[in-house]
Amino acid sequence: MAYRNQQEFIKALEKEGELVRIKTYVDPKLEIAEITDRISKSGNGGKALLFENTGYDFPVLMNAYGSERRMCMALGVKHLNDVAKEIEGLFKLLSSPKENIIDKLKLLPQLGRFASWMPKVKKSIGECQEVIMMKPDITRLPVITCWPKDGGPFVTLPIIHTKDPNTNNRNVGMYRMQVFSERLTGMHWHKHKVSAKHFNEYKKLNKIMPVAVALGGDPVYAYAATAPLPENVDEYMLAGFLRKKKVELVKCISQPDIEVPSDADFIIEGYVDPNDELIWEGPFGDHTGYYSLPDWYPRFHITAITHKKNAVYPATIVGIPPQEDAWLGKATERIFLAPIKMTMVPEIVDMEMPVEGVFHNLVITQIKKEYAGQGQKVMNAMWGAGQMMFNKILVLTASPNPSEGGALESFKITEYEKLAKHVFKNMNPATDIYFSQGPMDVLDHSCSKLGFGGKMCIDGTAKFEEEIDEMYDVRSEMYDVSEILLTGKFSEIKSVNVSLLQKQIPVIIISVEKSKKGHITELHKTICEMKEAEGIKMILYVEHTVDANDLGNALWRFCNNLDPKRDNMLYKAQSSNNRALTTSHIQHQTSNINYFACMGLDGTRKTKELDNFQRDWPNIIVADEKTIKAIDEKWDQLGLGKFIPSPSLKFKEQMYGESAVSLQKI
């Protein structure tokens, strides 16, 4: 379904009871974000919010994509899987053998459909150009400031248009924009992004780079801008496919080489000069739940701003999960499962990106396994597949027994307890965990080097005979070790989560206050030498400010803070007398000695003093007390129902100081 514009989408949301209008004055600086954070975490994503009284000429739309239902409405489908099924059908149709002329002629209607999705450039002006600011001034837009330590207000749902100067190929992406003055913002494109490649090409040619930013319009545009498409595939073709109608584009007024959606609410036109000095941009409370720290990025000079007469300013916030962006990620997970399966990993059955993994940190993949080593084959293929190159932790699962002909176990990978039992039943910590390194998201603060760090694959697939180490001692008996670990002997341990252990999943989570170099390595060895720990296959360590028994938040912190290649500690010992084997013995063992193994993973905060970590470590994102109090006091006026306390309250004591950079000592 194609929406004529954002206003039609707003009406549809309101008709379905998915939107609340807020008529009380709410400040775009921090207050809109605090209200949205409460609503988005209130269960099932809450409602979309239309702030009609912001002190500006334009209302602000928030949380429009923040639930499965609203995400489906934005894409015009009943279920997110519907898109994947349609894409898979197209792939099969195009790739199937055509035996005669009749079969080939049957393709013609489908090729006609392809043509109907291609974007079209209109010669007339668009709705987005109904009003032209004679003196462009982005500060007249209600650009929100999301978090107290942000560097300023940021445009958070910008649909950014650039072109390759050599091929004229368009790219549409989404990169935050910090507002510095009336006609100047930052342009936060990372080095891996296509727009950054375009920037570098303009730099080689010593040419000014035209750029245009759209806000609003059909809600599918913002999704298409986030989609992980191949470099030379036009995002507006994807948008046309999703809305079943081609996107109509118009030429910009001051940057006529760039075309933008006719139905957008706002267009911000301008340029980036490759010869400009870069600007110090940030901090910004990012989708990882941590601040991304300041760095140098290009300047975007605004040359024109146009908008519709009844324009609505769309925005989003990101931060500690879950947030609205989780549903944009879920749509990508579902939509791009079919292309991955049809082009790169044919054995893939399903894929899941848990919200605690904030997209790249944790991906679970279910495969149909048919031969030994297939898990490693999938691992390498996945890490080479577009934006999957940023993945940190990959968990593989498959059928429970290869001899059963590859039949899948009767659980979905979203059933996490059953999944974990399956994975850890089939996983030998000494042989089935693989480490690598490569490109990482620039926002990953755990890497010792910016954008380059460790990766880990946990192969939880059922093993063929060739993959099994017969010397591994599989222990079925597991002990509740929490009482032992929470004694005076382990004063550095603040909490222990044995909830998984109690469900026969051999994993525990331990919260530790580090006080010396090598503390986690030493502690892991000490714990593993206890007889009661012999059945445990993995121990996850988090920092002392984290409640290990708050499973979701502990996993979120753990995944963010781990560099798997740097932060792993494999303990391996003889089963008979618990004598620890050396690392060399682990890697080159030839004797027939039964052993057990436990993998330790250090997901604590890293510092210069204790870990020789040389980069700044960011703080988690928490609202300030003044903003929390202001929203508490005006809650009854907002029309949002029962009072919802600030989600930030549970995290206030987990901060290290008050700045975006965490204090080294606290």
PLM feature spans:
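Extended, highly charged
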Residues: M1-I666
